[in-house]
């Protein structure tokens, strides 16, 4: 049986870049890594609490963190920045305040910026979140996969693969179903493939959603 490596880690340094940009001494490395995780969790939790509803979803593609001597810079790539800016009136300022309460900044400054993704449905995180929202609202999984693939047809995507595992449609025995359109060359290292795993909480249990998107070949 073939061993499945994470497509992002497999291409790190070739077609994939790191999401955190900083250096640290060995005895201080784990503290900064924990801080990064806290910041990302805080942002995702804020989006789920204040923005995500039955009709829309956060649409965060990725979060990049850059550290300098006394500055932490967070860049949030999102497909729908208006949702984040206009939420609850204050939006980004309230989110920044939430992150500051989680961290012990000391003399450091925190800067936060929003960057709009031109084609939201070329990002696997956004597509996986859309699929999860549909499944949680009890939409049939085949219809959901078909709709997600249709959303990518008008974009620059060359191939997409979607896999959903769990008690599909409430079946007693869990199984795995998948759909693919176009090419998804997972063993070609120079192929720019984005990948995401996202869990969906349904009344029958947790469904695991995996999305692979092939964008271009370098």
From Swiss-Prot:
Belongs to the universal ribosomal protein uS3 family. Part of the 30S ribosomal subunit. Residues 47-118 form the KH type-2 domain. This is Small ribosomal subunit protein uS3c. InterPro entries: KH_dom-like_a/b, KH_dom_type_2, KH_sf_prok-type, Ribosomal_S3_C_sf, Ribosomal_uS3_bac-typ, Ribosomal_uS3_C, Ribosomal_uS3_CS. Keywords: Chloroplast, Plastid, Ribonucleoprotein, Ribosomal protein, RNA-binding, rRNA-binding. GO terms for biological process: translation. It is found in: Plastid, Chloroplast. One of its GO terms (cellular component) is chloroplast. The keyword Nucleotide-binding does not apply. SUPFAM superfamilies: Prokaryotic type KH domain (KH-domain type II) (SSF54814), Ribosomal protein S3 C-terminal domain (SSF54821). One of its GO terms (molecular function) is rRNA binding. The gene is rps3. PROSITE patterns: KH_TYPE_2 (PS50823), RIBOSOMAL_S3 (PS00548).
